[in-house]
Amino acid sequence: SYSNLNNAQSTAATSQIDNATTVAGVTAAQNTANELNTAMGQLQNGINDQNTVKQQVNFTDADQGKKDAYTNAVTNAQGILDKANGQNMTKAQVEAALNQVTTAKNALNGDANVRQAKSDAKANLGTLTHLNNAQKQDLTSQIEGATTVNGVNSVKTK
């Protein structure tokens, strides 16, 4: 019934339930196991979208440190979730790992970096006096249509 627990957690939970000497003790051990099982499920849900996240511009054009923080948080979560090799982590430790994943995902700034690159490119365009208005308008459209920092920068250099 504790399908989200790794083997170490499951063994520990079963042991706590088996070793309880009162009904209240059994109930407390079961409640602890249930809460941990829920937290582990939430941790799994927190990384289920990792492949999608890693393909999005918000990740691919993010600062390297922010990409690393997300990747490391996911790797840490996967280690906890590993059925065979995961450690007997507490609910608080599991929740901290989920918080690490969520915080790192929310800190990804690839989309903001693309917006900044567009802003910089358009500002640079304004300084190019050798271009006529039609050329500037065409380049502005290309800048706006770009979806990555490299895409924006390739327009600037034309």
Q: Where do the protein language model's features map onto the residues?
A:
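Amphipathic alpha-helical assembly segments used for oligomerization, scaffolding, or translocation
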Residues: 1-158
